[in-house]
Amino acid sequence: MTGSPATLAKLGSIMQISYVPEDYDAALDYWTQKMGAGPFFHTEKVEVENVKYRGEPSDIQFSMAIGYWGDIQVELIRPNNGAPSMFKDWRKNGLQGVQHLCLIIDDLDHARALTAEAGGEVIQEVSLPGGVGGAFYADYGGGPGTIIEYLQIPQAGLDGFAAMRQMHLDWDGKTNPVIGKE
């Protein structure tokens, strides 16, 4: 098997569009009030372990909000410290729009091998607390907005995403547009 584009595409379907907006709160307002996405679930301090950015350990701290827009998960990320990360670099470079897309996969090692075969570069990687999963972000050289996140999470995480999506389907578009944010 080779890491051809067709092989990479078979790893999974895009389930998330992620942004690292200049103004996190304005982005939440845009997605909830203009686009009808939500409700969003805000986490002030995302817990990740064993973070590496471009192969070096990093103590990134960031906030995240996740909501659904139909079947697509929308993720907003706000870097909260100056530690090296692709999120910090995105903001430092003044980039706007989609930062990365995410696929849920079953085997990180397999995805990593296919990424290497296709000439992709793993630019950031994280483990979830307790070793229950993880993610890596690969750059295939397509420019801003073309980074792919490969995420492996346990069934409980998938169930959580399904519950968020169901809340979106049942949501009135007004009540509690952002859950967990003061």
Which residues fall in each region the model found?
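Glyoxalase I/VOC metalloenzyme domain signal
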Residues: 1-15, 19-41, 54-121, 132, ...
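Conserved catalytic-core motifs of GNAT/GCN5-like acyltransferases
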Residues: 41-45, 126-127
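Residue-level detector of flexible, active-site-proximal loop/helix-junction positions
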Residues: 46-47, 129, 157
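Short, charge-patterned binding micro-sites
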Residues: 47-55
